[in-house]
């Protein structure tokens, strides 16, 4: 599930940088949960062709993340927000203030 979640985030953040065909295949495979055979049948191409294009698209998305780091930054912010919420729920203003300062520093 973690891999699917990670790929969904990569598609959300960087999907627009893929070609329209890559976007279509990644959407079908990861977000619509279609099999390689189903995608190949709909597109009139071989299963291997779909597999190869998906693998190239995945590599491109990972490369974009390595260079830009938007997903990493998003996850860090989400983690800090969770800490802030927990600190506020516990009434721990020192931890809450530290979390706010961390968010401001980003």
How should each PLM-predicted stretch be described?
Residues 53-56:
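Residues within the DNA-recognition helix of helix-turn-helix
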Residues 9-18:
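Short amphipathic alpha-helical boundary/capping segments
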Residues 67-79:
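Short, basic, alpha-helical segments at the C-terminal edge of helix-turn-helix-like DNA-binding modules
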Residues 46-47:
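Helix-turn-helix DNA-binding motif, specifically the short coil turn and the N-cap/start of the second
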Residues 58-65:
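C-terminal flanking helix
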Residues 25, 39-40, 50:
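Hydrophobic positions on the alpha-helical face of helix-turn-helix-like DNA-binding modules
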Residues 79-106:
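Helix-turn-helix/homeodomain-like alpha-helical modules used for DNA recognition
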Residues 20-32:
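Short amphipathic alpha helix immediately N-terminal
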């Amino acid at each position: 599930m973690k891999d699917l979640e990670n790929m969904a985030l990569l598609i959300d953040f960087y999907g627009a940088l893929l070609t329209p065909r890559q976007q279509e295949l990644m959407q079908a495979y990861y977000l619509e949960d279609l099999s390689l055979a189903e995608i190949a049948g709909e597109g009139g191409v071989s299963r291997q062709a779909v597999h190869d294009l998906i693998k190239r698209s995945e590599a491109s998305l990972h490369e974009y993340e390595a260079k830009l780091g938007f997903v990493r930054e998003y996850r860090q912010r989400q983690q800090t927000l969770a800490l802030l919420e927990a600190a506020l729920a516990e009434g721990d203003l020192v931890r809450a203030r530290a979390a706010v300062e961390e968010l401001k520093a980003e």
